[in-house]
């Protein structure tokens, strides 16, 4: 079990760039929960820093994930700004159960295939958890950009899995950051559910 003192000491020892990336990440998730288009520039800066940090730290899957996040940050900003310029909001939509099952099925298959590759090449300390977090994060970021209501529920699960991954690999500071991400994902879920209900009324 992770000692609270270990977490505090790890946070105090965070390198400057990791601290900046963490703060940018917090700003991103808060703004995303409020449906602000300005979440995306913060996301771009956050993931740019993490791409470099994870690559230098020999975590290629996490570096690849953050590189993808950079592209999605550009896509999300263009998409959300387009609707603001047209004075129309992207409506929050809810997926049917069949779409959610398909989402989970595709994500699971891709995760298993990726984990098999990671296990065979021995480039990950925790291949199955690493693969699952990466694949579902990639898929779920698209749901966020398209304002699919269920994305926050998935983020809660993904971020919880990421916490376990970073604890296993002794990235305690990043694990602590993802505890905050999980809490903010609950806030995002509540806010978006309220907006979705308002849309229907």
Language-model regions, residue ranges each:
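Short, flexible micro-motifs
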Residues: 61, 79, 173
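Generic alpha-helical scaffold signal
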Residues: 20, 39-45, 61
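Individual alpha-helical transmembrane segments in multi-pass integral membrane proteins
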Residues: 59-72, 178
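Polytopic alpha-helical membrane-helix bundles and their juxtamembrane interface segments
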Residues: 2-35, 39, 83-87, 91-153, ...
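Amphipathic alpha-helical packing elements
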Residues: 49-53, 59-63, 163-164
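Membrane-water interface of transmembrane alpha-helices
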Residues: 67-84
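Hydrophobic alpha-helical transmembrane segments of multi-pass membrane proteins
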Residues: 42-56, 70-72
């Amino acid at each position: 079990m992770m000692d609270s003192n270990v977490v505090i000491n790890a946070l105090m020892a965070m390198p400057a760039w990791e601290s900046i990336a963490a703060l940018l990440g917090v700003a991103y998730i808060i703004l995303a929960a409020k449906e602000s288009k300005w979440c995306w520039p913060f996301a771009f800066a956050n993931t740019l820093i993490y791409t470099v940090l994870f690559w230098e730290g020999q975590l290629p899957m996490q570096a690849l994930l953050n590189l993808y996040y950079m592209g999605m940050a550009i896509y999300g900003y263009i998409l959300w700004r387009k609707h603001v310029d047209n004075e129309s909001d992207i409506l929050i939509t809810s997926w049917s159960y069949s779409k959610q099952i398909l989402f989970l099925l595709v994500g699971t298959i891709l995760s298993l295939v990726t984990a098999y590759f990671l296990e065979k090449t021995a480039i990950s300390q925790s291949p199955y958890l690493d693969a699952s977090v990466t694949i579902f994060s990639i898929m779920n970021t698209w749901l966020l950009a398209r304002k699919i209501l269920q994305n926050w529920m998935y983020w809660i699960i993904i971020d919880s899995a990421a916490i376990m991954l970073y604890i296993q690999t002794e990235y305690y500071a990043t694990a602590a950051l993802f505890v905050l991400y999980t809490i903010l994902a609950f806030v995002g879920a509540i806010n978006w559910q309220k907006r979705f209900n308002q849309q229907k009324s």
